[in-house]
């Protein structure tokens, strides 16, 4: 069988040229040891302890002395040295030394041939690996399972997966017992080549042939199936595996439960969870994590809380990642009471204290639901526990205060952030500018903006758009336009929001021609207009009483797949009521 594989390669080994000159300082001790050395001296110098501490230069020097000694050390001694060099990943040197041995008439054995085969497989030079296998077998050496595993790995990495499968089948036919390395190597290769069904078939075929894969092999196949989104096949394989008297462990159950939860097979996941407990397999944190997360995703908050309580009663302590993910899930759904309870559980457990991420999540939740003072309380508690807030912490609070129209406290938090040595990033500054502008503090925003420019901060388009809008709303449309025109010089490209903001400024000032010109420029050279752009211009034309221009814009907007927004509908409805518009406008928008 192996002869049919090995016959592929018949070429001689490529000649490697390596200068065997070690560093005189590092090899001196070896040279002294082998001055007039016998093969017994070699054996002593190749003890396990010496080889463990061997450096490359010393190994080269030692080889030089070994080939000078008479009689030559045995091939076993040479094998030990070559193996030590191979462990240094110096395979080119191993090949070169092997060639020198051959030229000196030192015959290789099974072990050295296996090293060479492993080298060529790692280098994806399979034809040379097969040539050595053929030569080895011609000399009467049958390959070991280690050698065949090297060849198998070479086939898998060399995109010759069908030959890898055939090799394993032939191994079984010839009486070899594939080990864990054999199976896992082939399984990983099959999954890398999107051959999941063949991986399952391989396991089933091996069982029929009386070559039972072990738990590790089943685990590799099940893991691969779940990663590919086929947890139902993994579940079937688990059932077959257990019928074959191979008991799955908690890792395999966790893998399938996680896969079932990810792909929304929640009932199957809980059935498996119950089966697991019935069989006496104790669940751990990795069992509960996907189940609780899945319940949260389906909005089954009370069930999630019950399962969490069950977990804690069993003294299964969630890790920080689990707690943080769960707190985040509660916060996103507005379940702040549940999030606080979970936080309290973290503190009580004493196994897992809240970190900055947990505090930031809670603060974000309070700020999102306009409870920024409670967010500040969490921040103070965090500081009392010795944790220092990061950029996200302060930025979240600043944003929260601005949303609550509390401009003074927002600025106070910003000042505290700077005094605490936490560096604001561009997002912090953008939120500060936006908050100041929206609260009527444009002059303060301009001071901050000027400071940012003087510090050579890398301002983004959000920064510039915010300031253009603020200037336009403050009646400084010319200054807004100057800033817009400077963007190209700054290497910043305006986006659709920037164009729309500038057009809105022109329209607010009654500069209809400038708005039209910018709209034309936008369609020719800039980003494509969006719904906001069209609705901004339509409302401006309606306010000017230009029904014809409004109608044309509505038609163009609809042809681009956009519709009127709430503000435009509101304006049209009001104008219909007081008789300034015909009902046809409403029909055009709908």
Curated annotation (Swiss-Prot):
What is the protein name stated in its UniProt record? Pentatricopeptide repeat-containing protein At1g63070, mitochondrial
A Gene Ontology cellular component where this protein is annotated is: mitochondrion
State whether keyword Mitochondrion applies. yes
The annotated transit peptide is positioned at: 1-34
Q: Which Pfam families match?
A: PPR (PF01535), PPR_1 (PF12854), PPR_2 (PF13041)
Please provide the record's keywords in A-Z order: Mitochondrion, Repeat, Transit peptide
What the record says about family reads: Belongs to the PPR family. P subfamily.
For the keyword Protein transport, the answer is no
Q: Where in the cell is it found?
A: Mitochondrion
Sequence ranges of the PPR repeats: 74-108, 109-143, 144-178, 179-213, 214-248, 249-283, 284-318, 319-353, 355-389, 390-424, 425-459, 460-494, 495-529, 530-564
- InterPro entries for the chain: Pentatricopeptide_rpt, PPR/CCM1_RNA-binding, TPR-like_helical_dom_sf
Q: Which residues form the signal peptide?
A: none
**Which organism does this record belong to?**
Arabidopsis thaliana (Mouse-ear cress)
């Amino acid at each position: 069988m192996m002869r049919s594989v090995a016959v592929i390669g018949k070429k001689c080994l490529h000649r490697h040229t390596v200068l065997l000159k070690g560093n005189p300082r590092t090899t001196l001790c070896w040279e002294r040891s082998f001055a007039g050395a016998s093969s017994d001296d070699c054996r002593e110098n190749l003890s396990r302890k010496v080889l463990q501490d061997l450096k490359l230069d010393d190994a080269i020097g030692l080889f030089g002395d070994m080939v000078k000694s008479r009689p030559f050390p045995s091939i076993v001694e040479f094998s030990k040295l070559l193996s030590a060099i191979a462990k240094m990943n110096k395979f080119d040197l191993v090949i070169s030394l092997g060639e020198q041995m051959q030229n000196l008439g030192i015959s290789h054995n099974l072990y050295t041939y296996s090293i060479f085969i492993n080298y060529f497989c790692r280098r994806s030079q399979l034809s040379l690996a097969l040539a050595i296998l053929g030569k080895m077998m011609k000399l009467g050496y049958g390959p070991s399972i280690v050698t065949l595993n090297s060849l198998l790995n070479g086939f898998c990495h060399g995109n010759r997966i069908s030959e890898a499968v055939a090799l394993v089948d032939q191994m079984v036919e010839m009486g070899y017992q594939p080990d864990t390395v054999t199976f896992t190597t082939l399984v990983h290769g099959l999954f890398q080549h999107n051959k999941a069904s063949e991986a399952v078939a391989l396991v089933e075929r091996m069982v029929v042939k009386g070559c039972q894969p072990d738990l590790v092999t089943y685990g590799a196949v099940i893991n691969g199936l779940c990663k590919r989104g086929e947890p139902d096949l993994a579940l079937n394989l688990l059932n077959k595996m257990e019928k074959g008297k191979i008991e799955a462990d908690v890792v395999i159950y966790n893998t399938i439960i996680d896969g079932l939860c990810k792909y929304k097979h929640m009932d199957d996941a809980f059935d498996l969870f119950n089966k697991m407990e019935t069989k006496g397999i104790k669940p751990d944190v990795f069992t509960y994590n996907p189940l609780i997360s899945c319940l949260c995703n389906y909005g089954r908050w009370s069930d999630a809380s019950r399962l969490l309580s069950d977990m804690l009663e069993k003294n299964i302590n969630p890790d920080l990642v689990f707690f943080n993910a769960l707190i985040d899930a509660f916060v996103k759904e507005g379940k702040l009471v549940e999030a606080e309870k979970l936080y309290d559980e973290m503190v009580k457990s004493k196994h897992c204290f809240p970190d900055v991420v947990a505090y930031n999540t809670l603060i974000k939740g309070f700020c999102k639901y306009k409870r920024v003072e409670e967010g500040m309380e969490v921040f103070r508690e965090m500081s009392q526990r010795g944790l220092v807030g990061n950029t996200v912490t302060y930025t979240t609070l600043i944003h929260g205060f601005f949303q609550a129209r509390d401009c003074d406290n927002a600025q106070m938090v910003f000042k505290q952030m700077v005094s605490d040595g936490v560096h604001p990033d561009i997002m912090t500054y953008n939120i500060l500018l936006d908050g100041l502008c929206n609260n009527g503090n444009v002059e303060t925003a301009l001071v901050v903006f000027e400071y940012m420019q003087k510090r050579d901060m890398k301002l983004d388009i959000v920064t510039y758009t915010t300031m253009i809008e603020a200037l336009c709303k403050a009646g400084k449309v010319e200054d807004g336009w100057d800033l817009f025109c400077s963007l190209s010089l700054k290497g910043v490209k305006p986006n659709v929001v920037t164009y729309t903001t500038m057009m809105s400024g022109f329209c607010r000032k009654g500069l209809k021609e400038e708005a039209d010109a910018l709209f034309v420029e936008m369609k020719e050279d800039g980003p494509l207009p969006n719904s906001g752009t069209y609705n901004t211009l339509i409302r401006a034309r309606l306010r000017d009483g230009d029904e014809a221009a409004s109608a044309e814009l509505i038609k163009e907007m609809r042809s681009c797949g956009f519709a009127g927004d709430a503000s435009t509908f509101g304006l049209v409805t009001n104008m219909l009521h007081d008789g300034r518009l015909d009902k046809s406008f409403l029909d055009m928008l709908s």
